[in-house]
A protein has these predicted regions:
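Long, contiguous binding/interaction regions
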Residues: 2-98
Length: 98
């Protein structure tokens, strides 16, 4: 059974390559209890993730995660919106100009 992100990828087919954008999401995790929900979302969108880096920042008791994406703008926005709705997590997205 396909998840939502995979269904969108299948539906868009060849259009995905033409409309694809490169973006980086900066995610701040202040509530460790929300990590499972975040990881589930990232797994759902795994087809679009180019790379991921997580940094624990013990001094401030938080974690910093950066995600590099190659996906249609709508997919990137949908993922950012879902991540932003998770309690204790904030996200910002930067897009490449090209």
């Amino acid at each position: 059974m396909q998840n939502n992100a995979q269904q969108q990828c299948t539906k868009e087919g060849k259009e995905m390559e033409q409309e694809s954008r490169i973006a980086v999401m900066a995610i701040i995790v202040e509530n460790r209890d929300s990590v499972d929900e975040l990881n589930t979302l990232l797994h759902e969108y795994g087809n679009y993730i180019v790379g991921r880096m997580g940094l624990p920042y013990e001094k401030k008791n938080l974690h910093i995660v950066s995600i590099a994406l190659d996906a249609p703008n709508e997919t990137i926005s949908a993922l950012a919106g879902k991540i932003g709705n998770i309690s204790g997590i904030s996200v910002k997205t930067a897009y490449a100009n090209a």
